């Protein structure tokens, strides 16, 4: 089997309904996978039940059987029994902390490597990379390690935008990612803009959506990646 993983930048684009823009991206992964497990651990300011309800409503037209991992007495068995895995956005540090707490990091990687579809957005995309070192989130809790699922052998930065409000003197996103590349010049970072996604199908990696992505690696800074690009070469990073 081969990896089938969809990494969405965000759950919304502008004022669109929750996950509405992502339906065309998600649908191809659900053809033979109807029983999905949703992992809400990134949700800190909402209850897991409410988070699950939002996802079920947002994906209702796909007619999937979605349950929350928090509803199962054995989280590891729930992962094994599901046809596919969904991980939502929120705080990436809390998400990874809980994945380690329930000993799910290695298991999810193994299950996805066997062909189980994986769909993540925002924090759920952050944890698909080598590590969470390029998340935008505040480190509200300390996971045992920053090492993540490694479904992609590089770093991701969802919600990518280099906008700087007039009069604001903090660093831009590009400046923050430059800092990363100074410390680790050999590891690529792909910034994915809201409304776009990366789709890994085995040895193929594609940029989906109508927005460019941006590459940061060593001396290469904020290099535009055109819409529809084949990024398979990054799987050899």
Curated annotation (Swiss-Prot):
What InterPro entries does the record point to?
A: Class_I_gatase-like (IPR029062), Peptidase_S51 (IPR005320), Peptidase_S51_dipeptidase-E (IPR023172)
The organism of origin for this protein: Shewanella baltica (strain OS185)
This chain's protein is named Peptidase E
Keyword terms of this UniProt record: Cytoplasm, Dipeptidase, Hydrolase, Protease, Serine protease
Q: Which residues form the active site?
A: 122, 137, 159
Q: Where in the cell is it found?
A: Cytoplasm
- Say yes or no: keyword Iron-sulfur present: no
Q: State the EC number(s).
A: 3.4.13.21
Which reaction equation describes what this protein catalyses? Dipeptidase E catalyzes the hydrolysis of dipeptides Asp-|-Xaa. It does not act on peptides with N-terminal Glu, Asn or Gln, nor does it cleave isoaspartyl peptides
Could you give one GO CC term from the UniProt record? Answer: cytoplasm
Record keywords: Cytoplasm included?
yes
- Coiled-coil stretches noted in the UniProt entry, renumbered to this chain: none
Report the superkingdom from the record.
Bacteria
For biological process, the GO terms are:
proteolysis
């Amino acid at each position: 089997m081969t990896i089938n993983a969809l990494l969405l930048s965000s759950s919304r684009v502008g004022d669109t309904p929750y996950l509405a823009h992502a339906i065309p991206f998600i649908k191809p992964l659900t053809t033979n996978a109807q029983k999905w497990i949703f992992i809400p651990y990134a949700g800190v300011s909402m209850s897991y039940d409410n988070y699950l309800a939002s996802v079920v409503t947002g994906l209702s037209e796909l007619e999937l059987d979605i349950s929350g991992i928090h509803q199962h007495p054995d989280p590891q068995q729930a992962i094994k029994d599901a046809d596919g895995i969904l991980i939502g956005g929120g705080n990436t540090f809390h998400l990874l902390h809980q994945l380690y707490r329930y000993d799910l990091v290695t298991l999810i990687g193994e299950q996805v490597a066997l062909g189980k579809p994986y769909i993540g957005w925002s924090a759920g995309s952050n944890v698909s990379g080598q590590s969470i070192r390029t998340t935008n989130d505040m480190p509200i809790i300390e996971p045992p390690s920053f090492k993540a699922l490694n479904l992609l052998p590089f770093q991701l930065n969802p919600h990518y935008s280099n906008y700087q409000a007039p009069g604001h003197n903090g660093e831009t996103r590009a400046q923050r990612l430059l800092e990363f590349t100074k410390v680790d010049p050999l590891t690529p970072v792909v910034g994915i803009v809201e409304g776009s996604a990366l789709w890994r199908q085995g040895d193929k990696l594609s940029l989906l959506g109508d927005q460019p992505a941006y590459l940061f690696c060593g001396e290469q800074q904020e290099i535009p990646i055109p819409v529809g690009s084949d990024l398979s070469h990054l799987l050899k990073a």
